[in-house]
Amino acid sequence: MSQQSATEVAILGGGCFWCTEAVYLEARGVTRVESGYMGGSATEPTYEQVCGGTTGHAEVVRLEFDPNVIAYRDLLEIFFTIHDPTTLNRQGNDVGTQYRSVIFTTSPEQEATARQVIAEMAAVWDAPIVTQVLPAETWYKAEDYHQNYFAQHPLQGYCAFVVAPKVAKFRKTFSDRMK
């Protein structure tokens, strides 16, 4: 990796943001993770509006990362391991466009990397990858009670049965990339 002085931003949507956030909080080189919304038409959307499926927004995480420690490509490899990029507008029992698989890019380089990783990952999956690659739009941070949700509610039903297995898969598969 080339030496760069500033952090970079990655914005990823792979279903419920509680899952994605919990994984990336443990990734070495990721310095900040926030849950939020992007990709729709509503301004200042609320969780209830996004879950209602009328805003067009996806649940996403905004990652700040040090490219000297973890490459954008590595973040995407994690992303494609912790969710199913072949199911359109759903992850498990979470159904709707707000749960779509999407990569919002912040530069032409990120877009090229995302498309390359998708092409490579296509060989891993039996079904076609439906992940969207779109330019980043206005970011809306989710309500405070969604931030660091898994750490605050590890025994809550959804966290125990959906989030925890994804975190365990990350820990097993990417132990060399953990903090």
Go through each PLM region and give its residues.
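Flexible coil/turn and secondary-structure edge motifs
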Residues: 1-179
